[in-house]
From Swiss-Prot:
UniProt keyword annotations, A-Z: ATP-binding, Cytoplasm, Disulfide bond, Nucleotide-binding, RNA-binding, Transferase, tRNA processing, tRNA-binding
Superkingdom in the source lineage: Bacteria
Pfam families on file: tRNA_Me_trans, tRNA_Me_trans_C, tRNA_Me_trans_M
Disulfide bond positions: C100-C195
Role according to the record: Catalyzes the 2-thiolation of uridine at the wobble position (U34) of tRNA, leading to the formation of s(2)U34.
Primary gene name: mnmA
Name recorded for this polypeptide: tRNA-specific 2-thiouridylase MnmA
Amino acid sequence: MKIAVLLSGGVDSSVALYRIINKGYSNIKCYYLKIWVEDELSYIGNCPWQEDLNYVEAICNKFNVPYEIINFQKEYYNKVVSYTIEELKNGNTPSPDIFCNQRIKFGAFFEKINSQYDLVVTGHYAKIQIKESKFLLKQAKDKIKDQSYFLSHLSQKQMSKLYFPLGTLLKSEVRQIAKNINLPNKDRKDSQGICFLGKIKYNEFIKYHLGEKKGNIIEKETGKIIGIHNGYWFFTVGQRRGIKLSNGPWFVIEKDLEKNIIYISHNENYLKQAKRKFLVHEIHWINDTPTNFENFKIKIRHGEKKYSCKLKLITNNLMEISLNKKDQGISPGQFAIFYKNTECLGGAKIFKIIE
């Protein structure tokens, strides 16, 4: 069996490589995917991918496995970065990591290697199971690290070639394995933030592409101007950090795109803005469309929290979702991801808040 391993230089993908080798497989090649943004914004700091590459080389040398660097800068820009920029311009809250997995790691990469490999291994925290000739996406053992939210737009064809060795492990167990076998990156911190940015700060990325435009920050209840911001695209509904005003905490509760105004409110008033009903479109099911939606739960952001909900299919590409509890941070552009027990069934894009 020929196996390709996506190696990032981090602990997770390195332990995934070790576990597949430990199963007795030897016909293995590792790939490091080099992406667009890191070079384009390298003026901000040190070359962010060089450190990754140093670890990739050290890991492959340790296990005597060949590796190759594949340049996907153009594909990243066209399929992920441009989407993110457009969503920000439209005042939405994008979820680029979902498309990073669907369109690049398991899209462009699969197209590149074509049928050369029988299996592609990554360090994602999730599980794939087969039931009645269908591939099911299941949550990982570690519910905190679980990445099924970001994998929710995979296809059956993509899942048929994927294996996630870390799906049955806790993060603490992965760290312990790395120490036990003395991996060169055993003490390396986990990467944070959006997949394509590397060490680049998100606001630097936004500033580079959309610039800055001064606008008013207005207290919703009083209509008073209490501050100035550098552009609505730097803010998302529900945001608390980064407002940098006294007498807080403050929360972003509304954005006026035409006038470039950010409306904020104190905590007690912010909680009153919570919503529970919204519309989604661009619906993707990992398997066939369910015949009923009983006992479904959804996530509206990455993390452990799921909501019980009622789903009403209006058309094949339009659905109304009613949560059992209100949420303060529902925002157009986010994705609602569907679950039944531990199975991730797919997801859809939020485009209108109702109540």
